Amino acid sequence: MNISSSRRTSRRRTTALALLACLGAGLLSACQKPAADGPVVRIGYSAWPGWFPWAVTEAKGLFGKEGAAAKLQWFDGYLDSINALNAGQLDCNSQTLNDTISSIAGGADLQVVLQNDYSTGNDQIIAASGINSIAGLKGKKVAAEEGTVDHYLLLKVLKDAGLKGSDITFVPLETGAAAAAFAAGKVDAAGVYAPFTTQALKRPGSKALTTSKEHPGAISDLLVCRTEFVKKNPDQIQKVVNAWFATLKLIKQEPAATLPILVQRSGVSEPEFKAYDAGTTIQTLAENRQNFKPGTTMTSLPYASQQISTFLVEVGLAKTKPDISNLLNASFVDNAKE
């Protein structure tokens, strides 16, 4: 991923023993210096190109270097990570803006503290041969993960084409299962994101009818935390945000050392991974600071939040428009280390 473009006994004795254990295992590079006082920040992430940099953060010990006590938890299923955050099993999670607003509509109290990226092609509605437009999905079986990002994209493009969700036969499947079902010919189309797009497009004659490239800013990928945890532990959140931007800097400066980590976490080949580059626009620190400000396009998080809130109610993914007045917390990007 071309991050360089504009576009993831006594305390002393215990520490000494831990260091010796790392040395003995030949893992000195993975040993982090003792973090500052505060609870461990439990951070969830899942398969998405804009979140794979977190694997570099962990592998290169960047949480510790920034003084953060943080632990990453990988989820094979994206929805599982959202549910874990809502259940208090995580303190922060990597998730989209629309899914965060859906959670708030369901009663969750969450804050956005960082924008990792926005999708510029890696979310796709993929269809079988013979289906040449979104309008052609009418009456067809279409799979996606219900209530999450590509279900949102599917409903958005259906609405733009003058259709409703009821005009298709919706098949709710986890994203990986949706890609597999489409590749096997069990459904006519699927809404999936990278890296699952690679599997879906192996079906002969298949093609993307539309992608997030045609909907700039509609899908923002974020670090979202429980408001209660943010209020109690702002210093720890700040250090986590600092570690993210340190990670982007390292990926830019040392591509040979970091690319293998990104590729391994993605589970695809290096050429396949590099093909995702244009479809995920990583947001720099300067872009984060700008995007948290009010604006009139979907790249402005305040504007996008209002637009998405209205849309979720219109298509039935939320019963009422949620209160998002405290959703965006710009303080951590505003105070992040340059």
Which positions does each model-derived feature cover?
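Pocket-lining segment of extracytoplasmic ligand-binding domains
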Residues: 91, 98-99, 171, 177-267
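Short, glycine-/small- and polar/acidic-enriched structural segments
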Residues: 34-172, 188-192, 207-210, 217
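Short, low-complexity disordered leader/linker segments with a strong preference
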Residues: 1-40, 336-338
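Short polybasic/polar patches that bind polyanions
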Residues: 64, 104, 159, 202, ...
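Conserved C-terminal helix/tail region of periplasmic/extracytoplasmic solute-binding proteins
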Residues: 305-338
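Secondary-structure end/capping motifs
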Residues: 232-317
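Phosphate-coordinating loops and pocket residues in cytosolic domains that bind phosphorylated ligands
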Residues: 139, 202, 329
